[in-house]
């Protein structure tokens, strides 16, 4: 497990240095370090939010529960505008699927929300705040996706993130986690 995590981190550093990394993944280590969030947690949250074939999608949108994978920021902005014209209110944006309705006012523009650096940075800061508020990374992850009154959604989400952590070598199924997620 540690070897896979070390390999991932090494490859991220190498690809970041070569400027060939996925723009979302290139920001994971920087933001994780800045806000003291375990990189495996931040990466696994990203995979849970926008992971396609093991890679985070920088211009992904979730419009009222429907995933849209735009190829560019411009295309994502167009999809966002069309969704708003149709009356959509709950729209998640970017690498880490930041919800525009609840968090959009913390960005200067839609372009900032879609910027991988700002998107991942905000997600890491938000997770750190949730951890401080709720005491554990498990609760922070659960609340990242669903509000305090939605225990079933929190459980499903947390278990998906744990599964991604295990799949990428950043964690193992503990007896407690297995019991919690498979009950």
How does the language model describe each region?
Residues 6-17:
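Bacterial N-terminal signal peptides
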Residues 1-5:
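Positively charged n-region of N-terminal signal peptides that target proteins for export
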């Amino acid at each position: 497990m540690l070897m896979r995590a070390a390999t991932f981190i090494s490859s991220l550093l190498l690809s970041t240095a070569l400027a060939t990394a996925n723009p979302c993944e290139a920001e994971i280590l920087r933001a994780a370090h800045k806000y003291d969030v375990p990189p495996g947690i931040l990466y696994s949250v990203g995979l849970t939010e926008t992971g396609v074939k093991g890679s985070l999608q920088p211009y992904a949108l979730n419009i009222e529960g429907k995933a849209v994978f735009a190829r560019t920021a411009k295309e994502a902005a167009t999809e966002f505008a069309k969704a708003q014209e149709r009356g959509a209110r709950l729209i998640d944006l970017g690498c880490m699927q930041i919800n525009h309705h609840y968090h959009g006012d913390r960005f200067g523009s839609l372009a900032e929300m879609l910027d991988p650096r700002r998107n991942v940075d905000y997600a890491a800061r938000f997770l750190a705040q949730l951890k401080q508020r709720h005491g554990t990374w498990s609760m922070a992850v659960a609340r990242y996706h669903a509000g305090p009154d939605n225990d079933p959604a929190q459980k499903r989400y947390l278990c998906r993130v744990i599964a991604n952590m295990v799949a990428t070598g950043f964690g193992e199924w503990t007896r407690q986690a297995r019991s919690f997620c498979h009950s």
